[in-house]
C-alpha cells in the first residue's frame, strides 16, 4: 500500500493516521511538539509531582463530550486499554448549573425528554421562567429558536449561513438583561460572539446542545475520567504504534515542495528531506497559511484563499486556567456557567469524575492538593471587574486573580465566610494554558485560537481533498457535517482526509464512515415543508404567518398536528404530495380557529 506523511499530531492528524494505518498504509506522523493531541493534550505542571506522584494535570481547556459527538466516540471505541477501551473511561455528567452574581442559589437544570415539537416550547419556557427573565423576551427567543428547529437544511445553508445568530434572533429587540445572556451563552459554549458567528453554525450547535438535555442516559454530556493524555492519547499512541505508525514528536516541518501539481517532499526544520506518496496537512488554522506556498495556491484556489485569508477575522480565544485546591470542592456534577462573569467563564470540578484513579492527592502533585477546578475563559477583549483590564492586557497573575474573583462573586453568598464555597485559603496554586506565550510581553501570543465561523465563512473553508493530486487537509477548518471547530470536527476532517486518499489511490478497502448531525424525527415534517417553501422562494412558515411569540409557535405546532394527524412524514411521501400538503396546511393554519 502507499506511504503517507501526516503533518500535525492533533486529533485530525492522529485520526487520519489511525484510519489509514488500519487499511494497510505506511504512515509517518510529524509534530513540532513532543506531546501528542494538539489543543486537547494535557499540560502537566512541570516539577509539581513529588515522591512518585505525577505532576499536577493542567490543560488548554477542559474537554467535554456531548451527545452529538459521534466520530470521536467511534474512534475511542476502537482504541484498546489494558482493561477495555478508551470509551469506557468517559463519565456521565448528570446535571449542569448557572451561577449568577447576587443570587443566593445556583440554578441547576436536569434533562427532560421531549416527544413532540411543541414540547420544546414548554421546556424552554420552564427553563427561562426559573431564571426570571422577562416573558416577552422568552416568548420571542423561543419562537425564533423553534423557527431554526423547523427550518430546512437548504434554508440554513443558503440563508442563515449569511447572517449572524444575533440578527436571526433579532437580538436588538430584547431587554438589556436578556441581551447580556444571549451574548454570554455562545461565548462560554463555543467562544463565539453571536453578533459574529453565523446563524447556521451557532443555530445548529445550539440546537444540538439543547437536545442534549432532551434525553437521559450515559451518552449525554460526558467528561473524561482523568487527564486527557493519560486517559485517551497515551493508549491511542500505543495503538497507532501497534498498527505500524511511526511517530516523530518534536520534529517540526519547515516546508512542502511542489512540482507538476503534486507535493514532491517535505523539508524538516533541521534540513532533512522526507518523501511519501501522499501528504496530510493537519496543522491549525493559525499555522496553515505559512505552509501553503504561492505555487500551491496557484494550483488550488481553495488553498490560495487559506494562504491569503485574514486569519484574525476568523478566530477567537478560548483559554483555560486550572485552580488546584487543598480540598475538593465539587460544586455540581457537571458544568457550571457564569453568565454574569465579564470574561465568559465556564468551569468543572474534575476529581469527582476521577474516582477510579484513586484519591487525587495520592496520585498527583506533592500530596497537598485534593481539588481541581478547570475553568475556560472565552472573553479576552473586555475589562474585568477587579483588575479592570482586558484579559489580553493582563499578566498571568492578574488573570488568575481576576478569574478567581469572578467565580467567587457568583458562587459565594452574601451571608459571609461561613457560607462561602470558594475561600482564598483553599487555593494552593494555578496553571494557565502553556500555549500563551508571554516572552514578548503583553499581549501574549496565542497559537491555538479557535475558528469562530463568521457569516459566509463556509465559502472560505476547503474540502479535505485539494486540487493537488497527493495533498489532503485534516483540521477543524475543513468542511464537515459537524461545522464547528471542535474535537468532533477535527476527527471528522481526519476521516474525510483518509477517504480522499482512498479515492485517489483506488484502494480496495472500505471507506471511513462519516455521519451527519442527528435531529429528532419529530421535526422531519416541518423541515420537509420548509424545504418546499425555500425552494419556491418563500419565507419560513413562521414569518409567513407573522408568528413572533412562543405561544403562537406552540399553537401552530399543535394545530398542525390536529389538521394533519401526523407529526412526521413517511419516507415514501413524494415531492408532489409534500407540495400539496404545504399549500393545504398553510391555508388552513392561516385561519383563526373557531372559538
Locations of the language-model features?
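N-terminal Rossmann-like FAD-binding beta1-loop-alpha1 element of flavoenzymes
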Residues: 2-29
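C-terminal auxiliary extensions adjacent to catalytic cores
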Residues: 543-595
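Conserved beta-strand-loop-beta-strand element in the redox core of flavoprotein oxidoreductases
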Residues: 256-274
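C-terminal segments that line or cap access tunnels to active or ligand-binding sites in enzymes
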Residues: 214-222, 276-278, 283, 287-461, ...
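Glycine-rich FAD pyrophosphate-binding loop
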Residues: 21-48
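Dinucleotide-binding Rossmann-like beta1-alpha1 core, especially the glycine-rich loop
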Residues: 50-141
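Active-site-proximal substrate-binding core of FAD-dependent oxidoreductases
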Residues: 500-555
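Active-site/ligand-binding neighborhood in enzyme catalytic cores
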Residues: 141-259
Amino acid at each position: 500500500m502507499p506511504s503517507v506523511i501526516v503533518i500535525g499530531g492533533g486529533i485530525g492528524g492522529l485520526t487520519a493516521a489511525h484510519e489509514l494505518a488500519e487499511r494497510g498504509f505506511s504512515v509517518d506522523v510529524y509534530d513540532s511538539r513532543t506531546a501528542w493531541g494538539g489543543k486537547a493534550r494535557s499540560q502537566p505542571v512541570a516539577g509539581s509531582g513529588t515522591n512518585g506522584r505525577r505532576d499536577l494535570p493542567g490543560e488548554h481547556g477542559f474537554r467535554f463530550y456531548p451527545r452529538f459527538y459521534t466520530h470521536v466516540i467511534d474512534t475511542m471505541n476502537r482504541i484498546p486499554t489494558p482493561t477495555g477501551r478508551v470509551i469506557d473511561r468517559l463519565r456521565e455528567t448528570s446535571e449542569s448549573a448557572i451561577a449568577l452574581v447576587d443570587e443566593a442559589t445556583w440554578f441547576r437544570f436536569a434533562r427532560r425528554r421531549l416527544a413532540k415539537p411543541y414540547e420544546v416550547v414548554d421546556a424552554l419556557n420552564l427553563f427561562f421562567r426559573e431564571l426570571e427573565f422577562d416573558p416577552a423576551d422568552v416568548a420571542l427567543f423561543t419562537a425564533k429558536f423553534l423557527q431554526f428547529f423547523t427550518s430546512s437544511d437548504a434554508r440554513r445553508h443558503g440563508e442563515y449561513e449569511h447572517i449572524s445568530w444575533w440578527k436571526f434572533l433579532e437580538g436588538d429587540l430584547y431587554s438589556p438583561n436578556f441581551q447580556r445572556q444571549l451574548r454570554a451563552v455562545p461565548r462560554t459554549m463555543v467562544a463565539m460572539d453571536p453578533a459574529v458567528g453565523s446563524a447556521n453554525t451557532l443555530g445548529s450547535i445550539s440546537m444540538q446542545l439543547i437536545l442534549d438535555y432532551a434525553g437521559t442516559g450515559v451518552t449525554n454530556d460526558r467528561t473524561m475520567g482523568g487527564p486527557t493524555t493519560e486517559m485517551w492519547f497515551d493508549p491511542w499512541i500505543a495503538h497507532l504504534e501497534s498498527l505500524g505508525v511511526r511517530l516523530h514528536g518534536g520534529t517540526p516541518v519547515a516546508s512542502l515542495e511542489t512540482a507538476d501539481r503534486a507535493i514532491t517532499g517535505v523539508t524538516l526544520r533541521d534540513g532533512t528531506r522526507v518523501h511519501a506518496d501522499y501528504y496530510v496537512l493537519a496543522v491549525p488554522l493559525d499555522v496553515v497559511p505559512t505552509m501553503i506556498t504561492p505555487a500551491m495556491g496557484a494550483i488550488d484556489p481553495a488553498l490560495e484563499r487559506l494562504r491569503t485569508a485574514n486569519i484574525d477575522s476568523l478566530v477567537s480565544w478560548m483559554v483555560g486556567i486550572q485552580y488546584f485546591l487543598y480540598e475538593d470542592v465539587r460544586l455540581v456534577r457537571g458544568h457550571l456557567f457564569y453568565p454574569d462573569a465579564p470574561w465568559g467563564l465556564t468551569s468543572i470540578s474534575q476529581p469527582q469524575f476521577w474516582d477510579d484513579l484513586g484519591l487525587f492527592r495520592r496520585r498527583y502533585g506533592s500530596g497537598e492538593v485534593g481539588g481541581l477546578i478547570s475553568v475556560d475563559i472565552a472573553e479576552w477583549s473586555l475589562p474585568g471587574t477587579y483588575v479592570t483590564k482586558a484579559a489580553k492586557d493582563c499578566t498571568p497573575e492578574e488573570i488568575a486573580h481576576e478569574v478567581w474573583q469572578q467565580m467567587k462573586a457568583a458562587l459565594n453568598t452574601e451571608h459571609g465566610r461561613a457560607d462561602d464555597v470558594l475561600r482564598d485559603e483553599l487555593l494552593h496554586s494555578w496553571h494557565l494554558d502553556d500555549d500563551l506565550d508571554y516572552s514578548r510581553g503583553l499581549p501574549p501570543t496565542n497559537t491555538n485560537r479557535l475558528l469562530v465561523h463568521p457569516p459566509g465563512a463556509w465559502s472560505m473553508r476547503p474540502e479535505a481533498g485539494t486540487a493537488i493530486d497527493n495533498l489532503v487537509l485534516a483540521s477543524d477548518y475543513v468542511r464537515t457535517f459537524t461545522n464547528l471547530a471542535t474535537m468532533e470536527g477535527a476527527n471528522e476532517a481526519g476521516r474525510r482526509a483518509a477517504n480522499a486518499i482512498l479515492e485517489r489511490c483506488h484502494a480496495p478497502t472500505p471507506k471511513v464512515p462519516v455521519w451527519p448531525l442527528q435531529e429528532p424525527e419529530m421535526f422531519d415534517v416541518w423541515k420537509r415543508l420548509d424545504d418546499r417553501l425555500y425552494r419556491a422562494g418563500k419565507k419560513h412558515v413562521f414569518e409567513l404567518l407573522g408568528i413572533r411569540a412562543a405561544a403562537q409557535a406552540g399553537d401552530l405546532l399543535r394545530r398542525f398536528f390536529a389538521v394533519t394527524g401526523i407529526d412526521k412524514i413517511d419516507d415514501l411521501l413524494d415531492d408532489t404530495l409534500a407540495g400539496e400538503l404545504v399549500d393545504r396546511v398553510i391555508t388552513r393554519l392561516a385561519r383563526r380557529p373557531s372559538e
